[in-house]
Amino acid sequence: LQPKSTMVSFFHTTRDLDTVKALKEQSVTGFSMHLIPRTTLAQKMDALSSQANIAGYKAVLMAASRIGIYMPLLMTAAGTIRPAKVLVIGAGVAGLQAIATAKRLGSQVEAFDVRPVVKEQVESLGAKFIEVESSDEEGVGEGGYAKETSDDYKKRQQELIHDHISKSDVVITTAL
């Protein structure tokens, strides 16, 4: 690298100390992509968010090519074919993209997330938000990310999801 240039990569600054030292000696400015914050402002440069977006989109396309029914509602001379029912578990970046893509293909979409705050985002995409009845913000952790839930919540969650999976043609899991 030329002195005073800029390097953008995935090197780990805390483990690749020799690389950091070599960059410093050449007055090279280094940006490690894994350290970019997961904020709205930095989302275009956030490698995890960009890959999650692609994963959500591709998951729906792969499902559409593999199920034995059509994604949209079809009305033909022979009758009406109901739309595919898609359940998306997890409404983060990948989940929201999966919801949007499935809706654009004409599917009937439901989504689940432990964070009740994403209900508005899910519904704004035209999907039905399914949730475990809870008196508090049980699944919401620091920074709005999901956190560990109680055993009682998990039991109710399993029952709810089991009921919806049994009625779905496609299930896409995006929750980490």
Predicted regions and their residues:
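Glycine/serine-rich phosphate-binding loop and adjoining beta1-alpha1 elements at the start
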Residues: L1-K85
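Glycine-rich phosphate/diphosphate-binding loop of Rossmann-like nucleotide-binding domains
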Residues: L73-H164
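An anion/phosphate-binding loop that grips the pyrophosphate of nucleotide cofactors and donors
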Residues: S168
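Conserved NAD(P)H cofactor-binding loop of Rossmann-fold oxidoreductase domains
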Residues: A175
